[in-house]
Amino acid sequence: MASQYYVGIDVGRRQHSLAVLAADRPSTWTQIAVFPFSADAPGFIAALHYLAQAGAAPGVTRCALEATGGYYSRPIYAALRAHGYAVQWIKNPAVHDLRETVYGRRSKTDAEDARLIARLLYLQEAVGQEYAFHLVQSGDERYQYLRLLVDLRWKQVQARRRASNQLTQVLDVLFPEFRLIFRKSVTGPTALHLLRRFPTVDAIADASVEDLHQVLVGEAKSLRHQTAAPQLKQWAQETAGLQGGTGPLQLAQEWLVQTLTDLDRSVADLDQRLAAAVQPLPEAGVLATFPAMSPTRVATLLAGMGAPVTQFPTDRTLRKQWGWYVEVEQSGARYRSRLGRGGNRGTRRELYLLAMQLVQDRAADNPFRHYYRRLVQGNPTPKVPKVALGHVASKLTSVMFVCMRRGTPYDPQQLWRHMGITVSA
């Protein structure tokens, strides 16, 4: 009878490490050889040849690898699956916890991690539930593509925020009165268009009022600034900004203006791609019926799922995936609970912002705001606002899960009745 084999693979950018553990020799796991191979076609061929030499045929072998390094693990995952091997992605904390247990605070090495992953597979089968670990959803290509777009958009938005802050600082030195004209933002579309047409304070001061008005209203379409041209020209002529030695700052301003323009176009392009990617997903139409829900927010939530809602058996599993779950620590009389650190950070952020938006006084009346107030004013034990907001986000996730599983739009009246709240007409 062929022995069972467990293969652990530590993934790197250009080189992977592979360890093969035989079920009939489990005690040797700390000494088993580790085979390094390059992350390309010759390396994959060498790895498959190594598995064959070790006797690890597809029918008697389980493979696992960490879902780390962005997309670096996908090629080897696909190659092993194509050759008939059973492959799993495991979450990083499983390997981290076993490493801490076995090695303590020793330095991490690729060889040790490959052996640990193989050991985890063996313990899961030999011991059972005590060594169960969380698997990563292999996902759906549509949702994976959506996650890529959402991640790219987030990076572009962060880059724009940094460039915006830098341009604001430069303008505070060169033309501090600029913010008196553009009170909302000195890096908005109208302000950037003006700075592209008139890149220096002197250029604004020398321009005619008619030219400034044409740029602000005729070209930038900013009706808010219909009467701003005369004041803008006057401030440019009387500015308290730096007058001499402004060459480096002027160069920085021109570069930042162009950078912000390019980033705005990039974000707009990504928004169009997100709208097209979200449209065919069945859950998108359901989420869009919830209050305070924007297209970007819908895309972020679906990207955080990574798979159709049918892959989640309960709302608790969806909360875990979205990063909105509670971790409890209890020892004797000591009890501590906190929001878990796992899950998708983007969806956790969106859930928090959505819950905060729904409970505000200026928001339209909705069941979630009543739920929040009931928790804050609770009897006999009121909850602090921060904790109550967490409960609102959790309730919101549960309602979203039920609606998506049923394929029905959000119905506030039904939720009012379910929560036992009577709404006056």
Residue ranges, per PLM feature:
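A detector of single, family-specific signature residues
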Residues: M1-A425
